Amino acid sequence: MSDEFNGLDGLSDELLSAERKLDILTQFKAHVKKTLVNEQVCVKYFENLSRLLVERGSNRRRGNDGDDVVFALAHSALCYLIKRVAMQAQHKFQHDLIELIVSTLFSIPFADKKVWQSSVKALEAIYLAKPNEFCQVLNESIAYNGSIRTNVLLLIDELARMESSNGRNGSMFLQKFIPFWVQEMNTNDSISNTDIELIYDIVANRCPEPMVRSMVDSVIRESAAKVFKSRLVGKLNNHGSESDMKDDFDRSITHTNSINSQVFNLQNELQSIMHQAPQFPTVPAPEPISYSNLSYLIKDLESMLPAFEGSRETEQNWKIRQTNVTKLRSIVLGNVSIEFPDKFLELWKDLNLQYCVTKSALSLRTSLCTHGCSLVKDLCCVFNSMLDISIIENLWSCLAKLMSNTKKIANQNAFICLITLLSTVPFHSRLFNHCFALIRDKNNVSRLYSSTFLRILIVRFHKRLISQHHVYVEEWLQKGLTDAQTTIRESMRITFWYWFKVSPMSGKKMLNLFQPQIKRALENSIPTHLDINYEAAIPPQSKESSRRSSLLPKRFPSYAAPTQSSHLPRSSIKRSLTDLAQGTQSFSKRSLRTPPDHDMNIDLTSELTNSQTNPLLNRYMKREEVEPEPLHVILSKDPKLGLDLLQKYLLSDTKIGDEEKVQSAIVSLIRTNPKAFKPLLHLPKFYQLIPLNFSMVLLPLNDLDISMIETQFKTYDIINNVISILQSLEDKNSEWSIFYVRFKYQIYNFCFNTIAKMLNTVTLSDQLINELINACGKDMDAEKYYKLILNIYLADKTKFVRLLKSTSTASTKLKIANVIQKKDSEFKIKSILNYPSVPEPIVSPEEHHLLEMTMVNPLGKRTVSSNTVIHNSLEGLDESESNPNIIADEDNHSEKEDLVTVPPVAKNSVNTVSFVADSPSDSDNDDTKKNGSDVVDHEEIRDHEESHGFTKFGGFSKLTEMTKVHSVFQPETVDENVDPMEVDSPDESNLDQKSLLTDIFLKNQHQEGSVSPIFKPQELNNDPRHDYDSDMLSDAINGIEIKTNDGSVANRSEDDIKTLGTNMGSVSDPKTFKPINLAHFANDSLFSFELKFIDASIGIVNLTQLKLIVQSIINNGTFKMNELQYILKCFLCYDQEVLEWIHDQHELKDVWAITELLLSSSSSESQIPTNIAYKSIILTACLLTIDDELEHTVLKDSSISQLFEHIISLVAKLDTFENEIYFACTELRTLLLSQDNNKHLPSFLEKCLKALCDTKEQYIVKISFLLETINGIISSMGNLLSVDVLRDLAKTISRYTPSDVAEWRFASCTALATIYSQLISRSTPVGYIRSLMPLLDPSDFEVVRSLSTTKDATRRLG
């Protein structure tokens, strides 16, 4: 015979793919199953399959799931090959081959019960073919192979069980091994205590007591004898004494009956039911027949069959049949139930003795029918729990037909047999369904008997019915209590109170659903012996007259209306047997998802573990199971299975591993299928597993309210999560946006109901009220929304009006205001408007002409002057025409500028002139403030001749009505480098700045060398008004103090700074502090430019003002842009008090707290406030520079890590690279990466990779920034990164190289080039590096190589 598989040598070829091996194994398995194998190469088959199984089994232990299919197919093929060779060529099973097979099958991991069972079946074939050689190999394995010793012992136990089930003596089979076991236990030290216990259990279960005693006495080794002694003592404690063992064995047969007999006296109840049933005909019991040999039993059973072969019952064969039935009863009552129970039941099915019973029981002859029913009774009483479901169903089918027989004695016999059957056999769901189907039968007798059957089931298995079948029991009772037949209703009433006894909640619920007449009938039929605690309600007496009631049309109850059953459609009263597994939706879900309303302890451990038929397998078998899939993986792969498993974990005390990953999987599943969580929402433990806001989102989507969790969480937490949910509903950039679009209506209404329920118990915060106001007009129940708004308004009118007034959307204001005005007549819409009328100032007639062509511009609304302003000198200026005390703050009219600084005029000048106000009280002479803003006093102007187109007041004669009126004593601004972000910007931050009067009119703008203003003499005017103005001007000039300024960083050279620092250090305290050296930043950097600009724009600073600014920001959380620039200036000054305060660790932490506040507010806003974010980044750079110079760093690692996250968040919101925030972030990143300490770099790298993985929407700027950051980190860390880390980085980065976005391609190629250089420096082969970048085309890889060698590769990047 040719071998088409070549001895399966291909399975050992490592170059052969797994798919090809699967094809070979599939073909080979099909060949072995169908045809004979080549005997010449069968040993080679075994060797190759064994080698493959051992190899794949070791891979499975390491968790390689890819080998599972090959392993399963190879194991199945080996088992089929063993059976084929055992049948075809038994002589091939020699000692070496058997040893190879046993070692192979027991060395592989038994992750599945089927693998073990298949192996046992295959080894059984070898045992049947070569029993002596096989037993010898098993003994040798026990002695010399300790790794498989336990599995071999379990195999011997399985073979002993098979011997007993096949009619042979299992104890005789074990006699082949017991002497060898005793010898090994006495001499072999490698036998563990577990194996000794297993040996004892095998012998104790399969052998008689004397044999067990003999083995125990033969063991002389102390450790083994001690184990036997402990096992024997434990058995005696469990069973009481040796004399009681037999009684315990007999009682174990009725264990199923006693396990549910706590509520009822089982024996008394079953006897009572039997006494109430019709009396069974008296049939004499035959003499029992005992057998010592199974062959005689088989011969006698086979001799009974010919009498039942005929299809018809005749005068000749019915007596023979009755005789055979009587003999069969004798056999059943004999010793077969003790000696051959399993074999007898197998013969019952193999010889089809059920056919004989059916022929007898359904006979028209009463005598034969009675003997057949007696046989059924005896069979149930003797074998009871040993009967399997197939025999029980056959008996039920026969007796159900007999019960519907018109002959009364026949159906009574069937009724008594079924009572006996239900009273003895264990619970089966199919048997329950058969009984339940009787209540829908057309036959009245069947429906009548079904009430008794239900009573038996309640008495015996009430716990099982409550936990799994209570829906069907309620329907069963409902139909019986409303049946048209009175006898059926009366019988079912008794059964109802049995159900009420075990499940009062269900019984009370049914009583409330019944009509009054049915309820009264039930209350009048309570069995006294059940001691049911129930008080019947007294119905109210009817006040209707008997005459009136008699004249009304006669009404019948639903169960007794005439011809009711004939008029109702068949579908409404008959239920198909195929529908028995389905109940009403609400009840079935409750029965499966919630614990029943009784105190029964539910044990779910059996459902969480792999069950085995043999208990010794679960206890001793060393299953090297592959780790089961984690719960979060199951939730992702199969959500329904995962949720069911999660429910079992929550119901039991089983600990859930990887709670964070499980939580993440649950949250992802909530977004896709929120309604699948309804069963879990009834479990309190579920709410501890996920964040509260997701729990609150699930409640409305599953028709539940806040009362489900109200008692588990604090009201404060619930309200905070309502705010969070309301904020998320309108977030269009979130990955939950589609989810909220689908369920926004339900979530909004749930939030409104929750707030309304808690309105009286908590004080609503401003944030919550603002969120509610902003929700106006969204997809919601408008009536419910406005009702809630009105209640909040009535609770605190002042607070609500204030918040409504601050709302920016006018339409929202008007909608809510109109609703409130309808309910509250006192409410005025004008109170929420932000445009109050400003009264016109009263101007005297003599001054009216001065204002006709002049526009007064409030100081707070002006912009920084630019080159478009025409400057003029102060020559010819009337000193009485101006007042220096008009400077006021726009936002707070009580706050004055403490300092007005004139920047240096000459670039080479060291000293500058400063004008310091005398005191706030002296300068507070303006009495014309209105509505919180200062109005500039209009001065009377005399007519002067125009010279060269200019007036003597510095104005241009051609200016239109848009002319601004400014103070002529405002300091001069020489530096014209104006911040492009602050000039003429509509941003709110510019409007809030404290402005300085810098619009100075100079006569000759080209005269840069002029240090001080030049005043021209002028004739005095005798006008009294001029005298008054002149006095005011003199007082103001006298209050001016001229002092020198120490200078600034921008006006000093580096040598001057060093010299000055040395001089200051020699004069003052030895410990001096220096400002930030701008050399830390590149000359062309944005940071350097901005700091120089700030240094030139602001003069001297003082510590008091700095402390006030910092404290104000920390306490109030608000600030102005000029305050932020003032803080930056402090880093550049030479004031030792200021520098010492900045270098103090505690104060530096306060400034860092301000920086974190600014960055977090900038990153959390959907639209970035440009000025705030920009200046915050500069301040951060200054703080990092200062912290780097300190001896002990102040900034914590967590602060640096949080800073890096803020940077990523800011960059993620940018739409273009041409943005000052982007450049500032890149420079700050360079500063972070260039620090001497590299301890933060691994954290930065991790955050970059996480941000790349979390990016669902492709942000161009963000991804480019992250790739460039990774490149910088790799360059900075260098050899600190292992090859494995570089490999993972390469795989992650290479995903962006084939992109169509040019920036991504360039950044990824640059980063890959850095990785390439690092690997090349470590002598890594180029081929290996190429394998790390599988997504790169050859041309892309060449680009990476060229970039790594600093060649020009830009032509390839296009």
Swiss-Prot record:
Pfam families: CLASP_N. Gene3D superfamilies: Leucine-rich Repeat Variant (1.25.10.10). Keywords: Cell cycle, Cell division, Cytoplasm, Cytoskeleton, Microtubule, Mitosis, Nucleus. It comes from the Eukaryota. SUPFAM superfamilies: ARM repeat. Residues 973-990 have a biased composition (Acidic residues). One of its GO terms (molecular function) is microtubule binding. InterPro entries: ARM-like, ARM-type_fold, CLASP_N_dom. The keyword Signal does not apply. Its main location: cytoplasm. Residues 915-950, 970-990 are annotated as: Disordered. Residues 926-949 have a biased composition (Basic and acidic residues). GO terms for cellular component: cytoplasmic microtubule; microtubule organizing center; mitotic spindle midzone; nucleus; spindle microtubule. GO terms for biological process: astral microtubule depolymerization; cell division; mitotic spindle assembly. It is found in: Cytoplasm, Cytoskeleton; Nucleus; Cytoplasm, Cytoskeleton, Spindle. Microtubule binding protein that promotes the stabilization of dynamic microtubules. Required for mitotic spindle formation. Belongs to the CLASP family. Interacts with microtubules. This is Protein STU1. The gene is STU1.
